[in-house]
A protein has these predicted regions:
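Glycosyltransferase catalytic domains, chiefly GT-A lineage
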Residues: 1-153
Length: 153
């Protein structure tokens, strides 16, 4: 996939509940802005935007359809696969709020493939990914969320 410098690169995060303060979003934005040479669109999906710097685009946190009483456990990330998620299209990089960025991010957008996720080094024999950082084509995989919501018991 070649970089399209006319189109800003989508970089997103999610903040819900009280585990992370707005400062985590602000720091993440600052790290991204220092480590992107390309134009980017930074979007935070949250239910509380108080304290988040104005450069960050705020969108409502999507709901996840889980059976009543089910623990959330971070599954909310799967809502990025909703059809028309946040009005985003094209390559999108998801970053957890507690990642530390130490180098340029532009290469995440030039690697081939529609879905990229880090192999989980803790379980080298399993085919699992670490979802702290992953790149996907926005709007391309709604069946992932549909399947999870129908089979999450």
């Amino acid at each position: 996939m070649a970089l399209n410098f006319d189109q800003p690169m989508n970089i997103i995060c999610m903040k819900w509940g009280s585990k992370f303060s707005p400062e985590y979003v602000n720091r993440l934005y600052a790290m991204v802005s220092r480590n992107m040479d390309s134009k980017f669109r930074f979007v935070c999906f949250t239910e509380n935007s108080e304290g988040i710097r104005p450069e960050v685009e705020i969108q409502d946190l999507p709901e996840l359809e889980l059976p009543a009483g089910s623990p959330e456990r971070g599954w909310r990330k799967l809502t990025v696969f909703k059809e028309n998620f946040g009005g985003l299209s094209g390559p999108t990089l998801f970053l957890d709020l507690d990642v530390v960025i130490v180098g340029k991010l532009d290469a995440f957008f030039s690697q081939p493939g529609d879905f990229l996720i880090a192999h989980d080094k803790k379980s080298p024999k399993k085919r699992e990914g670490n979802s702290s950082v992953f790149r996907f084509e926005a709007g391309k995989y709604p069946q992932i969320l549909d399947y999870f919501e129908k089979n999450s018991e």
